[in-house]
């Protein structure tokens, strides 16, 4: 058994779980950390896809009561029907663009320097958004209409650029379009479920020949680590947004992006790409 490989799996699982639902880009962090750990070959890339399932299930577990009510009330309650329709509307823009451009995006942007630039730009956008007057039109996720959902879905398209952050794009987009912090954050969590399930299973299907039973242990460790750390991150973020804005994440993104650029151009770290 390769204990160092298991350690890599544990580290990446924790990174995925902690960053997936924070506005700091899990994809960007996984690209950078995988590069540092020299786990960026084809198997490593499939691994980073598989461990996303742990993070998705963490959200499903945290909101299991609400999701169960939605499933059982579809067709009989208007609020459940509207909730599902809003998720579908918000899901479609990024899904369509992703299918059209994902190969090009992975070829040119899944590298440390483009990710670092996206970190910085995303951080600046968060600071700008936080300094705008915030007019709240929607206090609860249940009060959203299809127009709010479509706007958040269009904002999510920015997250196709690695380093941008899916949660960052949807949460800040939600704030920009009149959602309260709690509503924007929760809708981002719910929207992650169809988006990440679709992206994960699509990538797994495309790379099914790379998966082997010999890798089950490292994949399992990464999956469990992702689930536990994501559950903690989701609960922590909900408490955080009730009392703070997102500026701290913006400064983290900017600082981290600058460090990556400095290490890349100074030769301190031999990043790939």
Swiss-Prot record:
Q: What else is known?
A: Bacitracin is thought to be involved in the inhibition of peptidoglycan synthesis by sequestering undecaprenyl diphosphate, thereby reducing the pool of lipid carrier available.
Q: Quick one: where is this thing mainly located?
A: membrane
* An example molecular function term from Gene Ontology annotations: undecaprenyl-diphosphatase activity
Taxonomic classification, please? Answer: Bacteria, Pseudomonadati, Pseudomonadota, Betaproteobacteria, Nitrosomonadales
Question: What organism is the protein native to?
Answer: Nitrosospira multiformis (strain ATCC 25196 / NCIMB 11849 / C 71)
Q: Which Pfam families match?
A: BacA
The protein's matches in HAMAP family, at most eight in alphabetical order, are given as:
Undec_diphosphatase
Bilayer-crossing residues are 4-24, 43-63, 83-103, 109-129, 184-204, 218-238, 248-268
- Top-level taxonomic group: Bacteria
Q: What is this protein called?
A: Undecaprenyl-diphosphatase
Function according to Swiss-Prot or TrEMBL: Catalyzes the dephosphorylation of undecaprenyl diphosphate (UPP). Confers resistance to bacitracin.
The chain's disulfide connectivity reads none
What topology in the membrane does the UniProt record assign?
Multi-pass membrane protein
The answer on whether this UniProt entry bears the keyword Acyltransferase reads no
Reactions catalysed, as given in the entry = di-trans,octa-cis-undecaprenyl diphosphate + H2O = di-trans,octa-cis-undecaprenyl phosphate + phosphate + H(+)
The question of whether Aminoacyl-tRNA synthetase is a record keyword is answered with no
Q: What is its EC number?
A: 3.6.1.27
Where does the protein end up? Cell inner membrane
């Amino acid at each position: 058994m390769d204990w160092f490989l298991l350690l890599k799996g544990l580290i990446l699982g924790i990174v995925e779980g902690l960053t997936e639902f924070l506005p700091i880009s899990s994809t960007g962090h996984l690209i950078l950390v995988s590069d540092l750990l020299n786990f960026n070959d084809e198997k490593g890339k499939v691994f980073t896809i598989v461990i996303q399932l742990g993070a998705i299930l963490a959200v499903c577990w945290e909101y299991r009561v609400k999701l169960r009510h939605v499933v059982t009330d579809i067709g009989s309650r208007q609020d459940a029907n509207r909730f599902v329709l809003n998720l579908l509307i918000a899901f479609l823009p990024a899904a369509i663009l992703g299918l059209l451009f994902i190969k090009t995006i992975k070829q040119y942007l899944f590298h440390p320097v483009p990710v670092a630039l996206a970190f910085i730009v995303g951080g600046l956008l968060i600071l700008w958004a936080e300094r705008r007057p915030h007019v709240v039109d929607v206090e609860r996720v249940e009060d959203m209409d299809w127009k709010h959902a479509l706007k958040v879905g269009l904002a999510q398209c920015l997250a196709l650029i690695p380093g941008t952050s899916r949660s960052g794009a949807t949460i800040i987009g939600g704030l920009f379009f009149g959602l309260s912090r709690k509503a924007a954050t929760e809708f981002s969590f719910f929207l992650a479920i169809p988006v990440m399930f679709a992206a994960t299973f699509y990538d797994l299907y495309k790379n099914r020949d790379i998966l082997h039973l010999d890798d089950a242990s490292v994949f399992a460790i990464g999956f469990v680590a992702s689930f536990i750390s994501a559950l903690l991150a989701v609960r922590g973020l909900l408490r955080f947004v009730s009392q703070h804005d997102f500026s701290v994440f913006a400064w983290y993104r900017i600082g981290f992006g600058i460090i990556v650029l400095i290490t890349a151009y100074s030769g301190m770290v031999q990043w790939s790409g």
